[in-house]
Swiss-Prot record:
Stretches assigned to the Peptidase A9 domain: 1-143
A Pfam family that the UniProt record links to this protein: RNase_H
One CC-aspect GO term: host cell nucleus
Site note Cleavage, residues: F596, Y597, N751, C752
Active site (record annotation): D24
Reactions the enzyme catalyzes: Endonucleolytic cleavage to 5'-phosphomonoester; DNA(n) + a 2'-deoxyribonucleoside 5'-triphosphate = DNA(n+1) + diphosphate
Binding site for Mg(2+) 2: D599, E646, D669, D740
Protein's name according to its UniProt entry: Pro-Pol polyprotein
Outcome, altering Y672F: 50% loss of RNase H activity
Domain notes: The reverse transcriptase/ribonuclease H (RT) is structured in five subdomains: finger, palm, thumb, connection and RNase H. Within the palm subdomain, the 'primer grip' region is thought to be involved in the positioning of the primer terminus for accommodating the incoming nucleotide. The RNase H domain stabilizes the association of RT with primer-template. Integrase core domain contains the D-x(n)-D-x(35)-E motif, named for the phylogenetically conserved glutamic acid and aspartic acid residues and the invariant 35 amino acid spacing between the second and third acidic residues. Each acidic residue of the D,D(35)E motif is independently essential for the 3'-processing and strand transfer activities of purified integrase protein.
Functional note: The aspartyl protease activity mediates proteolytic cleavages of Gag and Pol polyproteins. The reverse transcriptase (RT) activity converts the viral RNA genome into dsDNA in the cytoplasm, shortly after virus entry into the cell (early reverse transcription) or after proviral DNA transcription (late reverse transcription). RT consists of a DNA polymerase activity that can copy either DNA or RNA templates, and a ribonuclease H (RNase H) activity that cleaves the RNA strand of RNA-DNA heteroduplexes in a partially processive 3' to 5' endonucleasic mode. Integrase catalyzes viral DNA integration into the host chromosome, by performing a series of DNA cutting and joining reactions. This enzyme activity takes place after virion entry into a cell and reverse transcription of the RNA genome in dsDNA. The first step in the integration process is 3' processing. This step requires a complex comprising at least the viral genome, matrix protein, and integrase. This complex is called the pre-integration complex (PIC). The integrase protein removes 2 nucleotides from the 3' end of the viral DNA right (U5) end, leaving the left (U3) intact.
UniProt domain RNase H type-1: residue ranges: 590-748
Binding-site residues, Mg(2+) 3: D874, D936
Length: 1143
């Protein structure tokens, strides 16, 4: 509109009343006569500024018309009788042609659609006219956004606000594309520069055309947002129910989410940072939890009156048989979308075609199939190099899982790689490549699937194999499947009978069928002749839990489901009869090298505190060829059940069978034991010996032992034979009868069985009166309650066997990991034996937890006194102090100390960098170049740049050992002096230290050393500086006298001798086991690393070790302690490895 026309009154209408409106360029909000707002509810309050001052006013959200065009906006009450319009509410009044960055070739897209359409010529011309008529509907620019005039969405959070997130590193190639998007959205008001307490990282995603899509990671925000109850229908359900008529159209709404406004109170949640500046969304952002549901609900509501339309997020599908009707309905859709404020992308749209692409599939009149684009992606798949690539490939394959009947079985080996992956690495083999190619070939040759006809009943055909179930869905009159379903049985389901596996598959099929039935009956065809008869399946034949059987049986009562037996599917008939069981033919015992007959028995115990007395009997026999008993055992077991006795007898026989070469037969009369050993034991072993309720099995130790024996000797056969029966062979009857007799004897003698004391040879001789070294003769030794005891002055003590002494010490020590004396006193309460203290010390030295936690009980050797350089400037010690409080832009101070004189130079720097170090030392080396520079291992001193600088000047670099400041004690001492002096001089003004550095340097260089009795200035120049308290006699000396005095001072320097070594000190040797101190141990964490080997001794106080990470490191012995076990003791570091995992 011409700007002059804006000065004229504009026709308006509100609530059916016509009035005038005036465009006000200075208005920030539209003003409505207050009489029209009496029945409205305010949505908030806002502060209004006018020439008369500021005032809080109610804000309303109303709908009115301007020049016949609908306007929805926030307004306030006005005392005038006309409307004052804010320019932001009617932007179309002054609308200029949109100018963004990248122009879309719209004409090219329209010609492409017209060339591919299947519409007759008349309708094609009508479509061409529609392109011109609705030009404002099409997307002319990339990143062009519509403007949906609806009440803004409010993004509500839960009880806790989201936490701001850091920005990820961004690929530099993505920055130009993202910058274009942000610039275009700023021009359209979709983004606004605004600071926020929230931040979401930008995550650019590459597009196929080489550009990048701007995606925001809103996962942290989504955690705090309540999920909208109304959610989108699943794409599979839409594909199964869409109308497939002759002419089909798909429309793509461009940037649909960005057309929906949000309330200003929600802006802060959407904030992100780009190029150091923060932006917020004024529209519904992509990636927000409820964006798809809110957007789809709006589009569905707009198009609800249009027949044969289906909406999935920003994709619109419609289909009709009549071309005229199709074009008429298309125009209605165009008109609705334009009035609503949406923009349509013709690049991704297909109009009036017989086959269109919708939701990733080719949609035809008969059904759906895989697109050429998808098949091309399959052919471009290469073997994955890591876990992420494998998951991406499986995600792509899973998209088409319903197109082949055995998809789950084909991809199962690939999914197994995910479970066995080590971090992000996978073990990909040639077999995996073949399997992947097999899946790709099957998908590329897959046929189209038929559409679901809602007026027909749904047919399900079910089949099963030992490892998987197969399902096909049909329309009642259909010839092609609607979809396939393949289900791989779990470990628990693999143990089911074939009938139960078929019922499991049927259950999975019916869950999916409820979505596909669309209110129609479901016809299930299976190899089961009569579903009602399966209820009579005997309990011993049921492997599944009762709850599963209850679920399966409920389908019999569902009136929507009918079960049929399909005679046309012979491959589905072969299911084992659940009423019969197959048994392997019994071999004659002469075919085995040995035969064990086992039995268990239990009687009621006469002891009221016990329930049973159990015993087991085992007979070892052979047939050469006659029956001959080689050995027999009758063993009491105590208070146990007969079942436990049966299992223990089989375990005993299996252990004895390990010593026999060749096949061995173990016969038991317990059906439970034989069936469990032959059928259930492999599953128990694989799942950790737990039952279906994930609880440990009864008698788990026995079953583990039997499983171990069977794995060590696979030719052990465990066979069930009934007890005393006329139906069993005579050669088995004899062995069973004897084993039963022995088991009964064991159960009866258990009460009078006396346990023999556990004595070794030493204690046995002691009881016989022989003199044993270490046992005093004056004490009395006797046997009581199966234990050897000694009567000592402090009381009666138990003497344990030698094999038990280590366990006793460890048990006493592990209670609280006490020291030698505390552990010894605890043991001495009950026990005594010779050399008890020595055994305690030995075991404590092997406690891994104490080794890495206790402090060292040995001191390192005396401190080495490094030789003082003979001349000034031979050796410099350098280090950084800081960070200090900012002072004129400086934060750090480089300290340089001369090794011979202690003379100090101070250089302020802004950072402890290599460049700052080199710059400062270049000033100093203009006076003299040192031979050696000693420093710690900071980054500024160990960089290649600093090493190159030193090499060019012939300077040797020397470094302190880590975590050992004593190595650079000269400069460390100066650092403490500098900090102390600065603190005292800067009380109340810590940021003024830069100006005081010359004063501090002068003070340090003229301070007397209590040891040397001279100042650094005197040691360097031979005379005092011109400062207070200076020796005035030296100021008048001639140059010859100064040099003579300087030589006298330097030759008289006091060289302290090395102090003598402590009696508790230690010296390192090559090959010695030592433990390195943890630099900064966390609370309740070990203070020492696991033992390492000394590889080289550089000097009495510095060594090279192979550290706990496998690296050679130079360390000071001040940070080491010798390991307790050195000679002949195994360096078992398993415990310490476990404890150091999280260091």
């Amino acid at each position: 509109m011409n700007p002059l026309q804006l000065l004229q009154p504009l026709p308006a209408e509100i609530k059916g009343t016509k009035l005038l409106a005036h465009w006000d360029s200075g208005a920030t909000i539209t003003c409505i006569p207050e009489s029209f707002l009496e029945d409205e509810q305010p949505i908030k309050k806002t502060l209004i500024k006018t020439i008369h001052g500021e005032k809080q006013q109610n804000v309303y959200y109303v709908t009115f018309k301007v020049k016949g065009r609908k306007v929805e906006a926030e307004v306030i009450a006005s005392p005038y009788e006309y409307i004052l319009l804010s320019p932001t509410d009617v932007p179309w009044l002054t609308q200029q042609p949109l100018q963004l960055t990248i122009l879309v070739p719209l004409q090219e897209y329209q010609e492409k659609i017209l060339s591919k359409t299947a519409l007759p010529e008349d309708q094609k011309q009508q479509l061409k006219t529609l392109f011109v008529k609705y030009d404002n509907l099409w997307q002319h620019w990339e990143n062009q956004v519509g403007h949906r005039k609806i009440r803004p969405h409010n993004i509500a959070t839960g009880d806790y606000p989201p936490r701001p997130q850091k920005q990820y590193p961004i690929n530099p190639k993505a920055k130009p594309s993202i910058q274009i998007v942000i610039d275009d959205l700023l021009k359209q008001g979709v983004l606004t520069p605004q600071n926020s307490t929230m931040n979401t990282p930008v995550y650019p995603v590459p597009k196929p055309d080489g550009r990048w899509r701007m995606v925001l990671d809103y996962r942290e925000v989504n955690k705090t947002i309540p999920l909208t109850a109304a959610q989108n229908q699943h794409s599979a359900g839409i594909l199964a129910t869409i109308v497939r008529q002759k002419y089909k159209t798909t429309l793509d709404l461009a940037n649909g989410f960005w057309a929906h406004p949000i309330t200003p109170e929600s802006y802060w949640l959407t904030a992100f940072t780009w190029q150091g500046k923060q932006y917020c969304w004024t529209r519904l952002p992509q990636g927000f939890l409820n964006s798809p549901a809110l957007f789809t609900a709006d589009v569905v509501d707009l198009l609800k009156e249009i027949p044969n339309v289906q909406v999935y997020v920003d994709d619109i599908y419609l289909s009709h048989d009549d071309p005229k009707e199709h074009v008429q309905q298309l125009e209605k859709v165009f008109q609705i979308l334009l009035q609503a404020g949406y923009v349509v992308s013709l690049k991704k749209s297909e109009i009036g075609q017989k086959t269109v692409e919708f939701l990733g599939f080719n949609i035809t009149k008969e059904g759906r199939g895989l697109t050429d684009t998808f098949k091309t992606k399959l052919l471009n798949i290469t073997p994955p190099k890591d876990l992420k690539q494998l998951q991406s490939i499986l995600g792509l394959l899973n998209f088409a899982r319903n197109f082949i009947p055995n998809f789950a079985e084909l991809v199962q080996p690939l999914y197994n790689l995910i479970a066995s992956a080590k971090g992000k690495y996978i073990e990909w083999s040639e077999e995996n490549t073949k399997q992947l190619n097999m899946v790709i070939e099957a998908l590329n040759t897959a046929s189209n699937l038929e559409e679901r006809l809602p007026e027909q009943r749904l047919v399900i055909k079910v089949n099963t194999s030992p490892s998987a179930g197969y399902v096909r869905y049909y329309n009642e009159t259909g010839k092609k499947p609607i979809m396939y379903l393949n289900y791989v049985f779990s470990k628990a389901e693999l143990k089911f009978s074939m009938l139960e596996k078929l019922l499991t598959t049927m259950h999975k099929a019916l869950i999916k069928a409820m979505d596909l039935a669309m209110g129609q009956e479901i016809l299930v065809y299976s190899p089961i002749v009569s579903m009602t008869k399966i209820q009579k399946t005997p309990l011993p034949e049921r492997k599944a839990l009762p709850i599963r059987w209850i679920t399966w049986m409920t389908y019999l009562e569902d009136p929507r489901i009918q079960f049929h037996y399909d005679k046309t599917l012979p491959e589905l008939k072969h299911i084992p009869d659940v009423y019969t069981s197959s048994q392997s033919p019994v071999k004659h015992p002469s075919q085995y090298e040995g035969v064990f007959y086992t039995d268990g028995s239990a009687i009621k115990s006469p002891d009221p505190t016990k329930s049973n007395n159990a015993g087991m009997g085992i007979v070892h026999a052979t047939y050469k060829p006659e029956y001959q008993v080689l050995n027999q055992w009758s063993i009491p077991l105590g208070n146990h059940t007969a079942q436990m006795a049966e299992i223990a007898a089989v375990e005993f026989a299996c252990k004895k069978a390990l010593k026999i070469p060749g096949p061995v037969l173990v016969i038991t009369d317990s059906f439970y034991v034989a069936e469990s050993a032959n059928k259930e034991l492999p599953y128990w072993k694989s799942n950790g010996f737990v039952n279906n309720k994930k609880k440990p099995l009864k008698h788990i130790s026995k079953w583990k032992s039997i499983a171990e024996c069977l794995s060590m000797k696979p030719d052990i056969t465990i066979q069930h034979e009934k007890g005393i029966s006329l139906q069993i062979p005579v050669f088995i009857l004899k062995g069973n009868a004897l084993a039963d007799k022995l088991a009964t004897q064991g159960s009866y003698v258990v009460n009078c069985n006396t346990k023999k004391p556990n004595l070794d040879a030493e204690l046995d001789q002691l009881l016989q009166g022989h003199y044993i070294k270490g046992y005093p003769k004056q004490y009395t030794y006797f046997l009581e309650d199966g234990k050897v005891k000694v009567s000592r002055p402090e009381g009666v003590k138990i003497i344990p066997p030698q094999s038990d002494r280590q366990k006793i010490v460890l048990q006493a020590h592990n209670l609280a990991h006490t020291g030698r004396e505390a552990t010894l006193l605890k043991i001495a309460n009950l026990y005594w034996w010779p050399n008890m203290r020595k055994d305690v010390v030995k075991q404590l030295g092997r406690c891994q937890q104490c080794l890495i936690t206790n402090a060292s009980n040995k001191a390192s050797g005396p401190i080495l006194r490094p030789d003082r350089p003979q001349k000034p400037f031979d050796k410099f010690f350098i280090d950084y102090i800081g960070p200090l409080p900012p002072s004129q832009g400086y934060l750090y101070v480089l300290v340089v100390v001369d090794g011979m004189t202690g003379f100090t130079w101070l250089y302020p720097t802004k950072a402890p960098s290599t460049s700052a170090t080199v710059k400062s030392l270049n000033v100093l080396t203009s006076i003299a170049i040192p031979k050696v520079i000693h420093s710690d291992q900071g980054a500024a001193f160990t960089s290649s740049t600093f090493a190159e600088w030193a090499k060019e000047r012939g300077i040797h670099l020397e470094f302190s050992t880590p975590y050992h400041p004593q190595s650079g004690s000269k400069v460390e001492r100066k650092n403490s002096d500098i900090k102390r002096l600065l603190t005292k001089l800067l009380v109340g003004r810590p940021t003024k230290w830069y100006d005081l550095l010359p004063v501090v340097q002068l003070a340090l260089n003229n301070t007397y050393s209590p040891v040397l009795k001279y100042t650094p200035h005197q040691l360097l120049f031979g005379i005092d500086s011109n400062t207070p308290f200076a020796n005035q006699d030296t100021l008048d000396l001639t140059r010859e006298e100064e040099l003579s005095l300087l030589q006298e001072i330097r030759t008289s320097l006091y060289h302290p001798s090395t102090p003598p070594a402590s009696s508790r000190s230690w010296s390192p040797v090559v090959g010695q086991l030592v433990q390195e101190r943890v630099a900064r141990p966390a609370s309740l964490r070990p203070r020492w690393h696991k033992p390492s080997t000394v590889l080289k001794v550089l000097n009495p106080r510095t060594v090279v070790i192979l550290d706990h990470l496998g690296n050679n490191r130079t360390v000071s012995i001040d940070n080491l302690k010798p390991t307790s076990h050195q000679n002949g003791t195994t360096n078992d570091t398993a415990t310490m490895d476990h404890l150091e995992k999280n260091e």
